């Protein structure tokens, strides 16, 4: 090295002695600036992910600061609860997709007389719940603040939608009743057109022990059960209208309602249910208002608890990251 030149990594004092540059020494043009986040491992490519600052760039050693016991409990509680919620939602999603696939293979269209396709509702509900639950599950397990922030936003959005639905249900109760009654009539008319509609209406009639929308005579609106129909089901009713469809046997007698529409009301009342499903549904709602309210409050409380736990975990992760930065010191 020539006498008039100095090393780019060394500085000289007035006596000509060389000594290493200190931390406060100005940078020189010969020293390249290290690339940001160089030599870091474990990052998912997101600045808010936990692995982004877990290793020192020079030493390559991970920080040894663990989460506190309370934060770990919150973390695994969020993971377990959302994992349990994701299982039935994924099952519902799979069942809905299977049902839609079967319907398409049978040539049944997406549109129908009822406002919404039951299988499509099952798919959408299962998809929303599974995506939200899995984001909370993975966000807590991986300590990923990006997913946890998204999870909190999704839960808040669901709570807002539920509050809006409650307000609309109270303010628009009368139009909702009329719409539900119309849906029952439409389901009767198109009973044989959609297997999902067929199944749901049968379950409603069996569960509420009713027949038709307002009375059992509403089945006259169906082309197959109308008394003027030339088919074998003329003046008949579905087996789900029968008081004892199995007739004390193991197999349902699908012909138990044959000819019931042509019978006298007193005679027909011994074979089938005469009350319509709409009055029966109103009576059921009045008798179970308290239970429905308790379920709604429980759902809101569960969502609020999950939101609070996620916020606590986010705060703990922020404090933990700040502590790691302090422990690592300036680079």
UniProtKB/Swiss-Prot annotation:
Gene Ontology MF term list: enzyme binding
Domain of life: Eukaryota
A GO biological process held by the record: protein maturation
Membrane found in the keyword field: yes
CDD domains assigned: oculospanin_like_LEL
Alphabetized PANTHER family for the sequence: TETRASPANIN, TETRASPANIN-10
Keyword vocabulary terms for this entry: Cell membrane, Disulfide bond, Glycoprotein, Membrane, Transmembrane, Transmembrane helix
Subcellular location(s) of the protein: Cell membrane
Protein name, entry field: Tetraspanin-10
Side Cytoplasmic, residues: 1-76, 142-152
Function: Part of TspanC8 subgroup, composed of 6 members that interact with the transmembrane metalloprotease ADAM10. This interaction is required for ADAM10 exit from the endoplasmic reticulum and for enzymatic maturation and trafficking to the cell surface as well as substrate specificity. Different TspanC8/ADAM10 complexes have distinct substrates.
Ranges where the record places region Disordered: 1-34
Subunit and interaction comment: Interacts with ADAM10.
Cysteine-cysteine disulfides: 210-277, 211-241, 227-235, 242-256
Organism: Mus musculus (Mouse)
Family, similarity comment: Belongs to the tetraspanin (TM4SF) family.
Topology in membrane: Multi-pass membrane protein
Pfam families to which the protein is assigned, alphabetical: Tetraspanin
Extracellular side: 98-120, 174-331
Lineage: Eukaryota, Metazoa, Chordata, Craniata, Vertebrata
Glycosylation sites: 226
GO cellular component: plasma membrane
Parts of the chain that traverse the membrane: 77-97, 121-141, 153-173
Gene assigned in the entry: Tspan10
